[in-house]
From Swiss-Prot:
Signal sequence, renumbered to the chain: none
GO molecular function, one term: 2-aminoethylphosphonate-pyruvate transaminase activity
Keywords: Aminotransferase, Pyridoxal phosphate, Pyruvate, Transferase
Coiled coil: none
Cystines in this chain: none
Domain of life from the UniProt record: Bacteria
Native organism: Bacteroides fragilis (strain YCH46)
Gene, per the UniProt record: phnW
The protein's name in its UniProt record: 2-aminoethylphosphonate--pyruvate transaminase
Length: 362
């Protein structure tokens, strides 16, 4: 099969060295794995998330990022709590679906998919609804690529004394942030996003005191984040159930490569440059971005169809034949396609993509 670059928001293109680490088998009971890989990366994750490493901890969970979102909602929201979900896309809406399944008391504030979650609206809602105990939203909503105002929203949530859950699936490791400074209680992300690992597990960066409060609350055995965390703490990296060993080892390598690149700030600069080269090039060909530049993330970029009758499938196939895989659109109000800027991809790759698009019939 002809190799290609995944210009998608995860799974994404990984380095050869990340792939190579999966060629070795690991024993889930061995210290070489649990202590030197799992425990080491748990500490590294907290170090990436905050300078306040004593107050925060991390827990890893098998499955996709959504498993972790469901696990947090199912364990952090008690029977007498109320969750406010602020949504401007499919992944915020999914939080509502999870709350519905668990019969959790919640309210969903729905915003337009091409507009940020309104800080003023959230502030007003919390001022008039004192029964809310937790607030959740998506930082980078990959439905469109929109970046919600994390700092401002976090400030409002903490000003009202609420617990904060942030889905940072597609931003953690690629956009600088400090969970302690922001007052985040639970941050959720996944191995196959900005850290540039492969799919197979997600992780939660949690305030220790809030994670302890999850004891006995979880509505699912396999998604019990307190029990998973306690097992890892006492077992020095041991997982309750079968660990995705190859994926974990690849993630450890990906973390090493993040540090070698210069950390989150350096990776963010590369993603921003990828985005700049892509957008400038596509605009020169007549393509129009869905979002205003001011609210656009450097993670994934949505473009409007260039004309009526545009055949996305043919366009997709043509690009794939030249070594690039892109994403279809995910919103109902406009015909779009999406191009991811994250992964082991660089500005020269996007310059080459633009030339391929220039030569493509569409």
């Amino acid at each position: 099969m002809k190799p290609y670059l995944l210009l998608t928001p995860g799974p994404l293109t990984t380095s050869e060295t990340v792939k190579e680490t999966m060629m070795t088998d690991w024993c889930t009971w061995d210290e070489d794995y649990n202590l030197h890989i799992v425990e080491a990366l748990r500490k590294e994750l907290v170090g990436i998330a905050t300078r306040n490493t004593e107050e925060y901890t991390s827990v890893l969970l098998q499955g996709s990022g959504t498993y972790c979102v469901e696990a947090v909602i199912g364990a952090a929201i008690g029977k007498n709590d109320k969750l406010l979900i602020c949504s401007n896309g499919a992944y915020g809406d999914r939080m509502g679906n999870i709350a519905e399944y668990y019969h959790i008391d919640y309210e969903l504030l729905a915003f337009d998919e091409t507009e940020q979650v309104s800080v003023d609206y959230v502030d007003d809602y919390l001022s008039n609804n004192s029964d809310v105990t937790h607030v959740a939203f998506v930082h980078c909503e990959t439905t469109t690529g929109i970046l919600n105002p994390l700092k401002e929203l976090a400030h409002v949530v903490k000003m009202h004394g609420k617990k904060l859950i942030v889905d940072a699936m597609s931003s953690f490791g690629g956009i600088p942030m400090d969970v302690s400074e922001l007052g985040i209680d639970f941050l959720i992300s996944s191995a196959n996003k900005c850290i540039q690992g492969v799919p197979g597990f997600g992780f939660i960066i949690a305030r220790r005191s809030e994670l302890v409060r999850c004891k006995g609350v979880a509505r699912s055995l396999s998604l019990d984040i307190y029990d998973q965390w306690e097992t890892m703490e006492k077992g020095h990296g041991k997982w309750r159930f079968t660990s995705p060993t190859h994926v974990v080892r690849a993630f450890k390598q990906a973390l090493t490569e993040l540090i070698e690149e210069g950390g989150v700030e350096a990776r963010h600069r590369r993603y921003c440059e990828n985005h700049r080269v892509l957008v400038e090039g596509m605009r020169s060909l007549g393509f129009v971005t869905l979002l205003d530049d001011a609210i656009q993330s450097p993670i994934i970029t949505s473009f409007l169809y260039p004309k009526t009758g545009f055949d996305f499938k043919a366009f997709y196939t043509a690009l794939k034949s030249k070594g690039f895989v892109i994403y279809p659109g995910k919103i109902s109000k406009a015909d779009t396609f999406r191009i991811g800027n994250i992964g082991d991809v660089h500005p020269e790759d996007f310059a080459r993509l633009v030339e391929v698009v220039r030569e493509t019939e569409y």
